[in-house]
C-alpha cells in the first residue's frame, strides 16, 4: 500500500511538471514556401510572423513547422502534398497553384491594375471568397488570401527595351504556363518554359536572353548577375496565394482556426509591404546592383498593353472559362477609384 501511494504521488508530480499543451492533442502545421530562410525575404519574414502568432494564440496546441526554400519539394510536389494532406499549408505563386487549379491563370492577364493598392482592393473584395469556394470544391484546397509576388518586369542581357519592337528576337524564359507564353509571343519575343530552380543556370549559360519576374525574385536569386537590362513595364501583378488543406482546416478547433486566419492576415501584411517597398524603389535598388533600368511612361506602357492584353484575355476566356475572366474584370471595375 505504501509503495502504491508513493507511486501515485510520483505520477502526480510528473503530470504537474508536463505543460498542459502536451497533455492536450497537439497538432502540427507544416508550412512551405520557396524563398531563402532569411528575414529580409518577404515570404520567410511572413512565415516567422505566422508561426509566432499561431503558436501563441493557441497556447501551443498548434505547432508550425516552416519548410523554406523549396525544402518540401518543387511546385508540383508542394501542391500535390496540399491536395493529399501530406502538407498542411503553403505560400505558393500563381504558377504553382495552376498545377492543381487552372482558373488561377486568369491572374496572369497583363496590365490589369492601376496600382498595388488597386490590386489589393480586388484581392480583398468578395471576389476572393467566390474564387476560394470554387477552389475548395475543385481541389480540396482553401485560399486564405493573396500577397505580392512582385510586379513582373522584363530583363535581358542584350539591350534596353523601351517599346514592343525591342522585344523582337529575344528568347525569354517564362513559367511553364500558356498565359505567359502567350504574353511573350504577343510582344514578338520567343517564350521558353523553364522552371524556377533552373533559371539562374539557364541565364548564366545563355540558354535564354532574358526572363520576367518581380524585384523580390530578381534579388533573391541574384539574377542581376546575368541580366544587364531591366524594363519596368509592370506587365503582371504576380501573386502568392496563402493556401491550406481544407480537411486540415475543418479539423481545427474554433480557436485554432481563428489563430490561422489572424496569423495569415499578419503574414500577408508583412509580405505585401516588404514586396511593394522593393517594387516602389526598384530603380534605385536594381541600379545599385549594376542593372541598367528603363522606366516607361504611361504612353509607352499603353503600347505594351495594346498588344499583350487582348490575346491573353482571349486565351483565358477560351481555355480557362469566360465566367472566370468576367468575374475578375467585374471585381476590377468595382474597385477602381
Language model: regions and residue ranges:
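N-terminal secretory/targeting leader peptides
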Residues: 25-119, 127, 134-337
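Absolute protein N-terminus
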Residues: 1, 24-25
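Bacterial N-terminal signal peptides that target proteins for export
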Residues: 1-10
